[in-house]
């Protein structure tokens, strides 16, 4: 685990020293002094425009020319246009610095910031750099019996010196709690599905949330059946592992404060059921529960901070498997709301799980708004790729606040349309609703959203976040390795705490 230390006096024992320069390549007094201390190494690096231009995210590591002391490298980092810096961009710089230092095998890093960088105070700037580096330090190696040399090395520490360290520490401690919640979400998402059965996943939720003061109720199939959740049970009926409904209630606000409900799709593994998926990349269906993991992670983040909000989270944990008892295309299920649903495609299972879970949370908790998070459709990935998650909502203000929160933490949302024409496409000939649209290949993410919308009560503000394209990545990003991204934790935490 990367150690982030805020110190009261500058140290010369770090192997690497971070230097920030914007695209204007101008030196302030402190940078001039540092350059002189290193015999003009920084200015010489800048003079070589082919080597360093100060562009945002450009990082050049040069060996120190000082023979005495521990500093062996200067890590020169481009800020680009400092006026265009955002919190998200600064965090990404922290992640990039850690990645470059790891490649260069620099085990300890020092950072000194004593003055504002554009609108950011030294305390805010350094806490964001530290947060980005901490997020980027995540690894999932628990099942590797041997590690490659490149995997063995990890940066040990970043030592930060600035004035008013107590303020910087306070800011970073909150960001670290949020990052640790992201790590839980990444961990449980990366976990192989033979390990994270619905029962095991539910136990892990209990283990991490109950010590934080969150009331957790794990509901088994007998009680799920008594609740009338035929849609959820239908998805899981082909699996040997019992489906679970996990209800998490965090009461950090007053009795008079309204409740926000978070609902997550928790399909532990999705074969597609009888409507079998292609075998290529089916292993990635371990991530089909990433929506539920985002919900759990957001509640961890809020509860660990003792945030003064009231939040309830509900996740339906199921496996969509084949067997002699599996749900068939053409089956009709009765949902908890009493509406009947025709299952035309067993691989459109997530919306069936969500239909019962969003209805349950409205019936029991009467929330101010409901936000569901799900890796719901491949269609959203076709539309938005891995840059944006899709946001569907019946309330413009809610959608705008979610999008704004996402921008601030670099978890982007794109507003997608709801329309009566899409709703008409999911009418069934023999039931109240069909689980896919009646025009093959058309508006798949929109018809899926409308399916969920059929189970939202009048007067309830609702947003549906389709995170299928952003939940996991085949490539490393500035803030983490390939695999589970942990998308949604920081977005939901930011929205609930600051925009609610």
UniProtKB/Swiss-Prot annotation:
Compartments (UniProt record): Cytoplasm
Enzyme class, spelled out: hydrolase
Gene3D superfamilies (UniProt xref): Leucine Aminopeptidase, subunit E, domain 1, Zn peptidases
Cofactor names: Mn(2+)
Gene Ontology process terms (BP): proteolysis
PROSITE patterns associated with the record: CYTOSOL_AP
Swiss-Prot/TrEMBL keywords: Aminopeptidase, Cytoplasm, Hydrolase, Manganese, Metal-binding, Protease
One Gene Ontology cellular component annotation held by this UniProt entry: cytoplasm
Disulfide bond sites: none
Catalytic residues in the record: 277, 351
Binding sites annotated in the UniProt record for Mn(2+) 1: 270, 347, 349
Cofactor info, note text: Binds 2 manganese ions per subunit.
Binding residues for Mn(2+) 2: 265, 270, 288, 349
Family per similarity comment: Belongs to the peptidase M17 family.
NCBIfam families: PRK00913.1-2, PRK00913.1-4, PRK00913.2-2, PRK00913.2-4
Name this protein carries in UniProt: Probable cytosol aminopeptidase
Native organism: Rickettsia typhi (strain ATCC VR-144 / Wilmington)
Phylogenetic placement of the source organism: Bacteria, Pseudomonadati, Pseudomonadota, Alphaproteobacteria, Rickettsiales
């Amino acid at each position: 685990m990367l150690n982030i230390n805020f110190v009261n006096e500058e140290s010369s024992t770090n192997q690497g020293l971070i230097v920030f320069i914007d695209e204007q390549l101008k030196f302030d007094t402190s940078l001039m002094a540092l350059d002189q201390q290193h015999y003009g190494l920084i200015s010489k690096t800048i003079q070589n425009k082919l080597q360093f231009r100060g562009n945002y995210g450009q990082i050049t590591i040069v060996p120190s020319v000082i023979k005495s002391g521990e500093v062996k490298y200067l890590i020169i980092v481009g800020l680009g246009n400092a006026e265009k810096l955002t919190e998200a961009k600064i965090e990404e710089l922290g992640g990039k610095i850690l990645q470059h230092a790891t490649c260069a095998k620099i085990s300890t890093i020092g950072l000194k910031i004593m003055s504002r960088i554009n609108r950011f105070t030294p305390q805010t700037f350094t806490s964001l750099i530290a947060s980005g580096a901490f997020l980027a330090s995540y690894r999932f190696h628990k099942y590797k019996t041997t590690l490659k040399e490149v995997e063995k090395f990890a940066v040990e520490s970043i030592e930060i010196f600035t004035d008013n360290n107590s303020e910087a520490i306070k800011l970073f401690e909150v960001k670290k709690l949020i990052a640790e919640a992201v790590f839980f979400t990444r961990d449980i998402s990366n976990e192989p599905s033979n390990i994270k059965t619905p029962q095991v996943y539910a136990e892990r939720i209990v283990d991490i949330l109950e010590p934080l003061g969150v009331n957790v109720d794990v509901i088994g199939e007998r009680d799920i059946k008594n609740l009338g959740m035929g849609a959820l049970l239908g998805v899981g009926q082909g699996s040997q592992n019992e489906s679970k409904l996990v209800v998490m209630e965090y009461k950090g606000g007053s009795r008079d404060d309204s409740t926000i409900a978070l609902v997550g799709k928790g399909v532990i593994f999705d074969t597609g059921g009888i409507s079998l998926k292609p075998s290529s990349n089916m292993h990635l269906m371990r991530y089909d529960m990433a929506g539920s993991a985002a919900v759990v992670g957001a509640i961890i983040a809020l509860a660990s901070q003792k945030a003064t909000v009231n939040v309830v989270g509900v996740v339906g944990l199921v496996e969509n498997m084949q067997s002699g008892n599996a749900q068939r295309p053409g089956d009709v299920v009765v949902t908890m709301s009493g509406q009947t649903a025709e299952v035309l495609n067993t691989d459109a299972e997530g919306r069936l799980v969500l239909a019962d879970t969003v209805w349950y949370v409205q019936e029991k908790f009467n929330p101010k708004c409901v936000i569901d998070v799900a890796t719901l459709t491949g269609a959203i990935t076709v539309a938005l790729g891995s840059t944006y998650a899709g946001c569907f909502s019946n309330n413009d203000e809610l959608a705008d606040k979610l999008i704004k929160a996402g921008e601030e933490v670099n978890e982007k949302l794109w507003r997608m349309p709801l329309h009566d024409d899409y709703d008409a496409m999911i009418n069934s000939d023999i039931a109240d609703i069909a689980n896919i649209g009646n025009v093959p290949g058309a508006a798949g993410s929109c018809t899926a959203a409308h399916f969920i919308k059929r189970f939202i009560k009048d007067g309830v503000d609702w947003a549906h976040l389709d995170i299928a394209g952003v939940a996991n990545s085949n490539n490393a990003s500035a803030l983490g390795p390939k695999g589970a991204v942990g998308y949604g934790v920081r977005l939901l935490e930011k929205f609930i705490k600051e925009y609610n």
